[in-house]
């Protein structure tokens, strides 16, 4: 059973006085120069989530992941040795895409331009009319591999040739505190995407506060995350863990959805306020509802720089804020 922990309310600025209490600078949200610095200093160095191991159930499986941030896509494969690898989806001959399908199963890849073939391990296996080339060395012409590692079934890549940190080091306490959550028992129920005309940090920031809930979500989740005891939906807890952060969201225990609302919320991250999970003693990872508050609903965990998991007791959902540069008046 989860042990109740009674702690005095502590604000984020009390824990981290270095954050200050003044207005937030705005240059980082609109200056093209700042954005270019972010690409080099952050996104080319950070570990980024590209998928789940369940997308590669057996050898021969593959999927593509678009990286609009950099204008290319990544090919993620499971080879005969069962190892998961990632490659630039680019033929080493003339730079053509070698695979056009978003996902599938195959024995290898053949470039549709000149027929160069590669194994699922990225090795160059065949070159038509290889005698017509001078000094061709297949061992040096395989697909360009990208650093890859797995955390709790999530596949991460790093675009640095030699990443400065391992994935475990990069995730740090945030990753350690969430080990054991039953991600592998989940079933993907839906996926959606949208284009939002804003800086990528605006999207991430919106998940890090619940101040907007009573207004923006007044026709949907307002009554689940705000109520007479907490009319503005203030957070229970907020913590910084290295570059990552997590927020515990309050839940209205008095809320009872009508049948239509219950159906709409059926595939949302399961809040304890409707399942009674905290009362029933569902075992949670250390980092989920860290204060063990009985009126807890969900945690919003933000993995730097742009990956978010909304986690309840029974379901979770992931959000990624992708980047596409468009600057203008």
PLM features: what roles do these ranges have?
Residues 55-161, 165-176:
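Rieske [2Fe-2S] iron-sulfur-binding domain
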Residues 24-69, 75:
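Non-catalytic accessory segments flanking enzyme active sites
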Residues 6-26, 184:
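Short, contiguous pre-domain boundary segments
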Residues 36, 40, 44, 89-92, ...:
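A broad, structural surface signal
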Residues 329:
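GGW-centered surface loops in extracellular recognition modules
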Residues 45-50, 57-58, 127-132, 301-305:
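Short Pro/Gly-enriched beta-strand edge/turn motifs at strand-loop
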Residues 1-2, 30:
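A noncatalytic interaction/capping subdomain that flanks phosphate/NTP-handling catalytic cores
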Residues 3, 61, 83, 89, ...:
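C-terminal catalytic domain of Rieske-type non-heme iron oxygenases
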């Amino acid at each position: 059973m989860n042990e109740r922990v009674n702690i005095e309310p502590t604000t984020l600025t009390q824990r981290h006085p270095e954050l200050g209490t003044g207005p937030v600078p705005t240059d980082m949200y609109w200056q093209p120069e700042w954005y270019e610095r972010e690409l080099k200093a952050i996104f080319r160095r950070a570990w980024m989530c590209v998928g789940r191991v369940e997308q590669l159930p057996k050898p021969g499986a593959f999927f593509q992941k678009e990286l609009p941030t950099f204008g290319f896509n990544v090919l993620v494969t499971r080879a005969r040795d069962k190892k998961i690898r990632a490659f630039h989806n680019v033929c080493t001959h003339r730079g053509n895409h070698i695979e056009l399908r978003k996902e599938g199963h195959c024995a290898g890849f053949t470039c549709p331009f000149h027929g160069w073939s590669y194994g699922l391990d990225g090795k160059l296996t065949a070159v038509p009319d290889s005698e017509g080339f001078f000094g061709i060395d297949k061992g040096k012409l395989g697909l360009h591999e990208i650093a890859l590692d797995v955390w709790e079934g999530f596949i991460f890549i790093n675009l640095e040739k030699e990443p400065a940190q391992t994935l475990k080091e990069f995730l740090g306490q945030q990753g350690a505190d969430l080990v054991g959550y039953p991600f592998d028992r989940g079933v993907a129920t839906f996926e959606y995407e949208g284009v939002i005309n804003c800086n990528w940090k605006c999207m991430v920031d919106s998940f890090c506060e619940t101040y907007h809930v009573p207004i923006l979500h007044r026709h949907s989740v307002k009554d689940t995350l705000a109520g007479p005891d907490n009319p503005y939906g203030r957070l229970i807890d907020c913590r910084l863990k290295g570059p990552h952060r997590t927020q515990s969201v309050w839940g209205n225990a008095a809320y009872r959805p009508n049948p239509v609302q219950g159906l709409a919320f059926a595939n949302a991250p399961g809040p304890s306020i409707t399942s009674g999970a905290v009362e029933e003693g569902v075992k949670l990872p250390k980092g989920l509802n860290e204060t063990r508050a009985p009126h807890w609903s969900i945690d919003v965990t933000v993995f730097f720089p742009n990956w978010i998991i909304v986690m309840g007791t029974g379901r979770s959902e992931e959000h990624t804020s992708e980047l596409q540069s468009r600057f203008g008046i």
